[in-house]
Amino acid sequence: MKTGDKITITVLTDKHKAEFTAPCLVDFEAENIYNIPLTLKGFKDNADKFGFKETVLPAITSFGFKVDGNKGKLLNNKLVWNSSNNPEFNNVTEYTATIKGSTISHIIPYLYDFKLKPTFTVSKGSKVYVGEVEQKSGETEVDFTRPVTYTVKSGDVEHDYTVSITNTGLPVVVIQQSQSGDFKEVTTGGLWGIGAKTVNKFVDFMVRGKDTEWVEDDQMTIYNADGTVDLATANCGVRLRGNTSQAYPKKPLAVKFKDKQAVLGMPKHKRWVLLANWLDHSMIRNSVAFDLAHLIEQAWKNNASIGEGIPWNVHGQNVELVIDGHHVGNYYLCEQIKIGSKRLDINDAYEDVKADGLVEATLENCGYLLELDNNYDENYKFITSHYSVPFMFKDDVLDDGIFNQVKSKIQGIEDNIYNGNFTAAYNDLDINSVVDQWFIWELTMNHEFLDPRSVYYFMNGNGKLCAGPVWDFDRATFQNVTNAKNQGSSGDRLKPYDEWICWSANPKSGLTSSNLDNGTSCIFYPALIKDPIFQAKVKERWAVMYPVLMGLEQTIRAYGKSQAVSFLFDSAMWPTNKAAIQKHKNNFSDWSGDENINSYPELIENFVTVYRNRLNGMNTLITSGRFTK
């Protein structure tokens, strides 16, 4: 380019296009880069000389989606937490996107059908195109699975916009309840009905109570984050679940399919659970705890010399839940703990053996899933004599002989532990699974094995009593001790990183169903932890598992990315500040210590730090041989 040559320059901004022509004042040399400072004012002030022309670019001035124009795809309501610390649904008629420069974006958290008809306005005299197809506001359907380029044209001037309509990046579960079954109110609390709380009312619609008969004409569909179908619409029954948690405003649900279904890559089964995680500000405590259990399983499977541990633990995935046309936030969809070839693979439960009618049910050919829980609310149950541990059969055992044989075996184990005959106890108690379960409870800082609550054991025929699977980690686990103390936690609700939780146990003998809460047995662990055989087994298994468990930090950070967008919506719908929680759970003081962290990256860093501190604290306790105070 030589002196005197004409240079035509075009300058584009978000809203304007400027063009002018100027002469070259110097010779440009090849293979050189020239930086030329440019101020438009001088050219604009001498428009005739330089042929300066400024054009206002055609623009999209508003962009959104009307609910009526996208029926069956967009919900007409939004869950909000009001100033009275109660959830409510507000009416929604339109979703309005954000326009920033040449980018238009909006997040619809539950979106699973990306073919939508947008409503938009443009600058006067402009037309809008996607490719070569002219777009009509409120009429033209567009697939927003991927970002779409909208071109606005006015004469020979055009302006491109990139439109991104996304969800949270999680699968979307859609449930539609039928009208069949029992929706009558289930109440708790109050005095003579005054002040009672309806536990099966979900904000402003009803779900069936946990003890109602299953129906088979509810429907569930599951969509992947990209809108593809993971589970085509399947018949099922949905009802409330949980003990304490059923009274929380964000309702946990149980699902039973009419036919076995594979869900999100998990094996086919009829029984599934949707955990609400209302008290878990991070939304991932259950996810991380089950991942921890799987790492422990992986460790012993890769090191046969230390022996087998818990053979199966729950799998699941965080999802967005839509039920009866309401988006209710982030849930953990997971396998329910059940006996079966794809779950806890032991002999069939007594009821199933009897129902099959192929053989006579005996102690040896039945499997027994046992829950240890102070709620003590199953049909077949007993309390041990020395430590008052409540054992409940999850499946009815109608044969008194079999029931008494299982009870006698477990009581015999406790007798031997109580009398210091640990070798004899381990003839009937699987020490490997008991150690592994203890690792999980202690690492997650889960207070509930003290009571105990939601603790599972099992027996396969007349085999050993085994610990597991593990369950229920949403409340006050992975605790930031300092923050929890500042929130109001005290006593055994605080769990220092360098002490054993089971040191806080207060086992008592002779308790009954009416006063189980007077003691905290912590099952058999306060006695086991003093046994040299148990201590040696702990050290042996920990040496193999500790390096594997260090990798859990990466898993937590990965959740920090995958759950970040969902957190923005869920934390707004279900805040976990002190006032919000205590409005629905009087005098609650079992804090995790992250409830007031509003930045998800900071919350995840807190989670990682807490886990690292607890892992290191346990490593020091074990390697130094400190098992007693």
Short names for language-model regions:
Residues 51-55, 61-72, 165-234, 554, ...:
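Regulatory N- and C-terminal appendages and interdomain linkers associated
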Residues 7-10, 216-225, 317-321:
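Short conserved beta-strand and strand-loop elements enriched in small hydrophobics
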